[in-house]
Swiss-Prot record:
It comes from the Bacteria. This is tRNA-modifying protein YgfZ. The keyword Zinc does not apply. It comes from Shigella dysenteriae serotype 1 (strain Sd197). It is found in: Cytoplasm. One of its GO terms (cellular component) is cytoplasm. The gene is ygfZ. Folate binds at residues 27, 189.
Length: 326
């Protein structure tokens, strides 16, 4: 029986989110299997995959030779290899790039659309899932596997879970939670990722930014001690020579329209407005507030005022749940 995605509802901020089950259609799964999986990924992504345990999931970036990110990945061990979750809009081009050197290695790299991605968040999310699984992931053990299901734990912006499972289990979970949980689509998970300060790289921004411009170093997504990987020289130079002048910011406020990925914003300079930044993602919440994830200069004043281009409404900087101090 096929699994049907849920219809959209206006997303809610994490502090007020009721128990919610989400279909994550805007994200997609991919895998690498085979004897050389670990070695191959170690030479392709910014994180140190050789140090990853079965209990961990990591942010990582897959970069081009100039250190610009094709995409960022949520990576975890899966079977005899690895699986990762990324935005669906970048999966096909990212896999094309990743496969370029695979002919020399014992690996199989493939999209995985057999499995379903679900998110569970909101009020008493843990209690709701505790009735359905014998063990749940936590800060100490962030990945748990049970049968056909892998559960990933996230701390920010509030405790939530990402479930990778087969269609039968996805339908079972939906049936079990339907009575107590609201159902929503990817936009709610996107709103939570924006709040958490997790970079959202869609097709419009693929190949545009080095990982540090999206705060990946603050999210444990870059190892500066591991051996070579594609783009490493540029990523290392940005750290050790201070070449990176950008950071990922969270803005909130009002806007008469949602800015699109790749668009710039405007910064108030006295009486005037100056174009600045690149939008990665934006969502309008049910209370009318707009939240925007944007890459801008890393020295913005905390009281800076922004707006969507030519808009009458304004946006301000909100704190992220992690520090950029090194």
């Amino acid at each position: 029986m096929a699994f049907t995605p849920f219809p959209p509802r206006q997303p809610t901020a994490s502090a007020r989110l009721p128990l919610t089950l989400m279909t994550l259609d805007d994200w997609a799964l991919a895998t690498i299997t085979g004897a050389d999986s670990e070695k191959y990924m170690q030479g392709q992504v910014t994180a140190d995959v050789s140090q990853m345990t079965e209990d961990q999931h990591l942010q990582a970036a897959h970069c081009d030779a100039k250190g610009k990110m094709w995409s960022n990945l949520r990576l975890f061990r899966d079977g005899d290899g690895f699986a990762w979750i990324e935005r669906r809009s970048v999966r096909e081009p990212q896999l094309t790039e990743l496969k370029k050197y695979a002919v020399f290695s014992k690996v199989t790299i493939a999209p995985d659309d057999e499995r379903v991605l679900l998110g569970v968040a909101g009020f008493q999310a843990r209690a709701a899932l505790a009735n359905l699984f014998s063990e749940l992931p936590s800060k100490e053990k962030q990945v748990v596997r049970e049968g056909a299901t892998t559960l990933l734990w996230f701390e920010h912006p509030a405790e939530r879970f990402l479930i990778v499972t087969d269609e039968a289990t996805a339908n079972m979970l939906t049936d079990k939670l339907r009575g107590e949980a609201e159902l929503n689509n990817s936009q709610q998970w996107l709103a939570l990722n924006i709040e958490a300060g997790f970079p959202v790289i869609d097709a419009a921004n693929s190949g545009q930014f080095i990982p540090q411009a999206t705060n990946l170093q603050a999210l444990g997504g870059i190892s500066f001690k591991k051996g070579c990987y594609t783009g490493q020289e540029m990523v290392a130079r940005a750290k050790f020579r201070g070449a990176n002048k950008r950071a990922l910011w969270l803005l909130a406020g009002s806007a008469s329209r949602l800015p699109e990925a790749g668009e710039d914003l405007e910064l108030r300079m006295g009486e005037n407005w100056r174009r600045t930044g690149t939008v990665l993602a934006a969502v309008k919440l049910e209370d009318g507030q707009v939240v925007v994830q944007v890459v801008m200069n890393n020295d913005m004043e905390p009281d800076s005022i922004f707006r969507v281009r030519d808009d009458a409404n304004t946006l301000h900087i909100e704190p992220l749940p992690y520090s950029l101090e090194e």
